[in-house]
Amino acid sequence: ITMKAKQIALILIPLNIILAYFVYNSINSEVEFQQVAKVRVAENVQKLKDLRQVQIAYKKVNNTYSNNFESLIDFLENDSMAIVKAIGETPDSLTDAQALELGIISRDTAYVLAKETVFDEAYLSSRNEKFPLDLSALTTVPHSDQNYSVDAGMVEKGKVVVQVFEISTTYGAVFTGLDAENKSFELGNLLKV
């Protein structure tokens, strides 16, 4: 082997090592991003489900969905919901009103704080336990200083006007602090319920 071949080999060996590092690092950073992204999306989906739960309860009490978080949080913190305890069974031959009048059944209504009713034991047991429920940060997108967007209105479906709501955020807000450029997510797209 000539002297020139040795010099070229000495230059190419470190160059190959550097290139191998960059290839490994680019693959590894994508894998790490996907792992973190999966957790962040799951966390936001859980918070969106929590907010949906509040909206549904809000509508039960107020007959409409809220289009702002102030009224939703105020409802959750300060309002109460009726819990009806039914005692007895209505016979098939009678309506509830008739059975109630005859004393066959009875109804007892109690009022409980909205947050205790909305986030009852049944709901809490169905939540993803990796992400604890924090009412003080319910409207904030995790890992960012941004809030979710909320909107409510009416939509006509098959000649029937239906009340609807949407709570959303962008993937850009979900991935705050991560290098999400050129990844498999469109940062402007919405994650919503």
Task: Annotate the PLM regions.
Residues I18-A20, V41, F131-P132:
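A generic short-segment signal for beta-strand/edge and adjacent turn/coil regions
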Residues K60-V193:
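Low-complexity, acidic interaction segments enriched in glycine
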